[in-house]
Amino acid sequence: MAAKDVKFGNDARVKMLRGVNVLADAVKVTLGPKGRNVVLDKSFGAPTITKDGVSVAREIELEDKFENMGAQMVKEVASKANDAAGDGTTTATVLAQSIITEGLKAVAAGMNPMDLKRGIDKAVAAAVEELKALSVPCSDSKAIAQVGTISANSDETVGKLIAEAMDKVGKEGVITVEDGTGLQDELDVVEGMQFDRGYLSPYFINKPETGAVELESPFILLADKKISNIREMLPVLEAVAKAGKPLLIIAEDVEGEALATLVVNTMRGIVKVAAVKAPGFGDRRKAMLQDIATLTGGTVISEEIGMELEKATLEDLGQAKRVVINKDTTTIIDGVGGEAAIQGRVAQIRQQIEEATSDYDREKLQERVAKLAGGVAVIKVGAATEVEMKEKKARVEDALHATRAAVEEGVVAGGGVALIRVASKIADLKGQNEDQNVGIKVALRAMEAPLRQIVLNCGEEPSVVANTVKGGDGNYGYNAATEEYGNMIDMGILDPTKVTRSALQYAASVAGLMITTECMVTDLPKSDAPDLGAAGGMGGMGGMGGMM
């Protein structure tokens, strides 16, 4: 086991604070509408330019191991805030730095660290309740666009795109961000349910110009089995032909004689049919077939529940207004399933999301909810260069997370104003002893830090602006972009409540642990002794060269 280097008390805390300050100072230059960029060197390819706090934090590793421990703990604050709300990483870092700095001063002055932590925790718990009371629901497109704009560093086009995407696919819809091909940002919306399975035979194509199969008002047969014998399907095919409507078959597979017969019937115009494989594998395939059945008002024909394909009737088939199939995807538009059944299915999947243990499972379940409840929108980010593309894409993803958080828990006044108001409301909070009261004051002082940093990044005097904002009430604050005072919500400067709450809670959590640190342990650096054997060999070879 390697020897350890151990530091105690003030020596440990000073080193830790130095690491905290290096990381926080690098991150906090990005805060606010006039925050600066940070350039990150990469071992290959062009450097990355970013204004995303967590991206900067993740790049920082310090040579001194004790300082690095401090930096890594604050990095954890940024990562946790990012995981919880997708934004607010810089705010969380600024709050953590302030609590740690003021807290360690109090420890050096002889306060009890545990009581300080209890005071900080008490203030934060009270502040969170006040934040919830200040929160305003965020439901209209204008507010969603404003939240997106602020989170994307005052880029209005991004805010509008996200609001438009949410408008099209609903609050539950899936919105993804991809690299675009042009200079302009674009929004692609897929209505209805789309899954990644294309037609089983190109002979089903009835729109040669687009290479797609389009079926108007089709019946939809859902079978959880392989279909290879056409006899099983004859009763259904005859019933569909009599009804004079097309048929879409979604099954585990359609092969051999069955597929050949369907193709022949389609080409002769006897009945219009298309077949696709069911999406997913194993249990997930069964679940997705059931989703499609709910959406289209049909029944999954499965031998597990005693249903046979030969006995299927038109009542067992689902229906939709339109189906479009190309070689890779199938889209079902306007299924006729009942709204109550769809909502029931969505509620059931939501329950599974809460119980899911892996991120992958959770993501797949959320996709299923979106396909049932809304649709899928893709924001394609346009830029002139790859460096700009990466930077812009990161901003759009941040803005998307922020708007989701806003829809979930509402919004508060932005620009650090909400925390100032909360601090003034709990200014009379008292702990059980004087040390806890100091902890409460440390937390209240930290709540001013985001506003002060935003103002500092604009080149103004933080104390003057902070005192002016404190003198106002409600949503009165400082618009750093225009350097004007006014009602922040009216000016469209909003922060999601969840983002502000998460930033404060995670900052206080990690900072409280750091204040109570009394000892730090790390590995001693290994001494790299030169390999004398190798050096001697080289010398000998040199001598031989001289003789020749």
Swiss-Prot record:
CDD domains registered for this protein in UniProt: GroEL
EC number: 5.6.1.7
GO biological process, one term: protein refolding
GO cellular component, one term: cytoplasm
Keyword terms of this UniProt record: ATP-binding, Chaperone, Cytoplasm, Isomerase, Nucleotide-binding
Xref: NCBIfam families: GroEL, PRK00013.1, PRK12849.1, PRK12850.1, PRK12851.1
Name of the featured protein: Chaperonin GroEL
Name of the encoding gene: groEL
Organism: Salmonella gallinarum (strain 287/91 / NCTC 13346)
Cell compartment(s), UniProt: Cytoplasm
